Structure formats: structure tokens, C-alpha cells
Amino acid sequence: MENFYKVGTIVNTQGLQGEVRVLPSTDFANERFSKGAVLALFDDKDNYIQDLKVKSGRLQKNFYVVKFEGFYHINDVEKYKGYVVKIAQENQEELNDGEFYYHEIIGSDVYENDILIGQISEILQPGANDVWVVKRKGKRDLLLPYIPPVVLKVDVAQHRVDVDIMEGLDD
């Protein structure tokens, strides 16, 4: 099977007409959840279920309300709560130099002054900037905003991120 990459999680239903709320995990949410987009549905055990074609999608707060073709009632979609929607690798957008996908960053080692401090486990999108969650041994997770003074260098090929932890970020 080809490579697929997560673009969102179905977190709930919306209304009675078969719409779902999708929590996006992509910087290309407008493209992924727009009319005509094709997504692959995976269950909570990461088993492929089926391809879905977006009939309509709209942003509502921090969710996308999406209607897929062929689903007309809440009963058709209720069972998909907690399932993940992904895109096939060949459907990924081409990126500019210095840009990267979440899956290329998650799992990367994080260094400050050439000292390993942990690994990126998750990327959050709380607002203006992404926040990278760094898992550390024996310490609580470190939340790093993805801003130039903090993230100094990202080497996707080496799975390495160099950072400068500003005062107050590690309290």
C-alpha cells in the first residue's frame, strides 16, 4: 500500500445531514477539505477503510465541517468518530525550500547548544504559531513555539532541529 499522511481527525458529527467535524492537522486545510478533494479514511487501528470525496467543507472555529459524498444522515457517519483522514503521498503539495511537512518533523531530535534535549512528538496549532511538543526523559514535555528566535535550524534529512530555549519557556 502507498504512503498516506494524516491531515485530520473526525472528532464528532455536525447536525443530522451526515456532516462531520474534522480537527485538521495540516497547513493545507483549505485544500484538503474543499469540494472535490479525495481523502482516505483510516480507523482507530490505522486500517484503511475507504476513499472519501469531499462534497463540501467549511471552517468553523478551529474545526472543519465536512460533508462527504454518499453520506446523507448522522447515522451514516456517527461510527467514524475518532477515525483519521489521510492523503496519499502523491497528492501532497510541492513545498518551497525551507518548508516541510509535519510528518517530516515529528520524531526529529531537538538540540540546544549541541545537547540532545528530546524528540518532537506532536505539533499543535493553537493560534498564530505552531507549537512543537518535545518529549524529554525524566521531565515534563516542553512546548516550543515555531518562531525564528526559538527554532534556529531544521534539518529534515538528518531529523534534527536546533533550538534556543528562551527564558520562561522551560519553567
From Swiss-Prot:
One GO CC term, this protein: cytoplasm
Domain PRC barrel: 97-169
Translocase keyword on record: no
Subcellular location(s) per record: Cytoplasm
UniProt keyword list: Chaperone, Cytoplasm, Ribosome biogenesis, rRNA processing
A Pfam family reported for this protein in Swiss-Prot or TrEMBL: RimM
Presence of keyword rRNA processing: yes
InterPro entries in the record: PRC-brl_dom (IPR027275), PRC_barrel-like_sf (IPR011033), RimM (IPR011961), RimM_N (IPR002676), RimM_N_sf (IPR036976), Transl_B-barrel_sf (IPR009000)
GO biological process, one term: ribosomal small subunit biogenesis
Quaternary data: Binds ribosomal protein uS19.
Domain notes: The PRC barrel domain binds ribosomal protein uS19.
Role, per record: An accessory protein needed during the final step in the assembly of 30S ribosomal subunit, possibly for assembly of the head region. Essential for efficient processing of 16S rRNA. May be needed both before and after RbfA during the maturation of 16S rRNA. It has affinity for free ribosomal 30S subunits but not for 70S ribosomes.
Record-stated family: Belongs to the RimM family.
Protein name: Ribosome maturation factor RimM
UniProt source species: Lactococcus lactis subsp. cremoris (strain SK11)
Gene behind the chain: rimM
